[in-house]
Regions:
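Short loop/turn motifs that connect adjacent beta-strands in outer-membrane beta-barrel proteins
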Residues: 25-27, 38-47, 75-94, 120-125, ...
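N-terminal signal peptide c-region/cleavage motif recognized by signal peptidases
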Residues: 18-21
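Predominantly the C-terminal beta-signal and adjacent terminal strand-loop region
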Residues: 208, 265, 329, 333-334, ...
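Transmembrane beta-strand segments that form the barrel wall of outer-membrane beta-barrel proteins
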Residues: 38, 48-57, 93-103, 111, ...
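Gram-negative/organellar outer-membrane beta-barrel architecture
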Residues: 42-49, 55-200, 353-354, 360-367, ...
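Hydrophobic, lipid-facing positions within transmembrane beta-strands of outer-membrane proteins
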Residues: 49, 65-67, 109-113, 151-157, ...
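C-terminal outer-membrane beta-barrel translocator/porin domains of Gram-negative envelope proteins
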Residues: 204-320, 324-326
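Extracellular loop and loop/strand-boundary signature of outer-membrane beta-barrel proteins
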Residues: 99-100, 141-146, 188-195, 231-237, ...
Length: 378
């Protein structure tokens, strides 16, 4: 249920709303190259909310969609830098408030509100959200799937502080998930109803982040790494006690002006007493959410983007990962690998924001994705 700030911001670009007023269309034309561009529409729309369509294509929940209402808040400093340097990408991220609702073909749905704020020239970064939803998913015991539903309320507050103007941040996050899970055990016996249980899960995350990326949207250069430890405890308002630790790295480098290479790594581990939904799973394009879970998870991914023109690009990617069960050695766990490709269009030059479509082949199926910004969110 958690939404990251960049995903909410990126969703606004995917709308590409076109006004019927001929004069209003001028804000969608970039004076630099005469191409379609949404930078001005996103950054200069300072009055009222914007309706934004949401497209969902995750194989775990099926195809679906929804809508969001977003309001951008650009600081005076960021606006000044953008207007003084219209050909440059301003590194300071805008703030955004959103209200959204979405549903999919398998009956899953989500609604909620979110705010991302960046203050004092990006010294402080804040995220806060409240969401309610219901998800119909599959839980795998080995290769045997069991249908289940989880519905509930998710609340989160997240703050990061930049250390002395450097690329290092320290931060903390509080989250509370109040949920009900219902499992269909697969036996058509009237006297045995589906198994269900309620759970309150509250936790505090402590984290250290390094971020030198040139933009939060579609980076061409830079590194973002985050090291975090989560403490879930009854003292924070929950019913369960467990811990999680995670290390994530996304690195981007321009091999040439028109060729960008990205490398991603992700490692997660969780204590024995974690609830089923908190167990790490392999998260890559081509693999459904929660398909391969374990007590430990590690993955690596490589992506290349070639800019055919300044606006149009093609991408290719591959990756592999393992989900390791308790008591199982890393070497005994099977690799789960993906390969895929797609295309991108530079839809907002002043944000270096690219959108497009990806197709990926995983161990069991093909999957298709609408990609807004970069597929790797951290």
């Amino acid at each position: 249920m958690e939404k990251t700030s960049s995903r909410i911001i990126l969703a606004a670009i995917s709308a590409l709303c076109v006004s019927s007023n001929v004069g209003a269309m001028q804000q969608f034309i970039d004076p630099k190259d005469g191409m379609f561009d949404a930078s001005q529409w996103v950054l200069d729309n300072a009055i009222g909310f914007m309706p934004v369509p949401i497209i969902i294509t995750d194989p775990a929940v099926g195809v679906g969609g929804g809508a969001a209402m977003l309001f951008f808040h650009e600081s005076e400093k960021r606006k000044q830098l953008r207007e003084e340097n219209p050909d440059e990408v301003v590194g300071l991220p805008p703030s955004v408030t959103a209200v959204a609702a979405a549903g999919t073909e398998n009956g899953s749905w989500l609604t909620g509100a979110f705010h991302f704020g960046s203050w004092q020239e990006d010294t402080w970064r804040y995220q806060g959200g409240l969401f309610y939803g219901s998800f119909n998913l599959k839980y795998y015991a080995g290769d045997v799937p069991f249908d289940f539903n989880i519905d509930g309320l998710y609340f989160m507050q997240d703050i990061d502080y930049r250390i002395a103007g450097s690329n290092w941040f320290v931060g903390a996050k509080y989250s509370l998930l109040s949920s009900k899970s219902t499992f269909d055990i697969g036996f058509d016996i009237p006297s045995i109803p589906p198994i269900d249980f309620d759970l309150e899960d509250a936790g505090v995350e402590l984290k250290v982040t390094y971020d030198s990326r040139d933009t939060i949207f579609t980076p061409n250069d830079g590194l973002k790494a985050k090291f975090s430890t989560d403490f879930h405890n009854t003292a924070f308002g929950g019913d369960v006690d467990y811990q999680k630790a995670r290390a994530q790295v996304n690195y981007f480098a321009p091999v040439r002006e028109d060729l960008i290479i990205g490398v991603r790594g992700d490692y997660q581990t969780v204590s024995d007493d974690a609830p089923y939904y908190a167990r790490p799973f392999i998260s890559m394009r081509g693999i459904a959410a929660m398909r391969y879970q374990g007590q430990d998870m590690a993955l690596a991914e490589l992506e290349a983007r070639y800019d055919v023109t300044p606006r149009w690009s093609i991408v290719g990617f591959t990756g592999t990962g393992k989900a390791v069960e308790d008591g199982q050695s890393f070497s005994d766990a099977d690799y789960q690998s993906v390969v895929g490709g797609g295309f991108r269009y530079l839809v907002a030059r002043q944000l270096n924001m690219r959108v497009g479509v990806d197709a990926a082949k995983g161990p069991e199926e093909w999957a298709y994705y609408i990609t807004v910004g970069h597929a790797w969110q951290l």
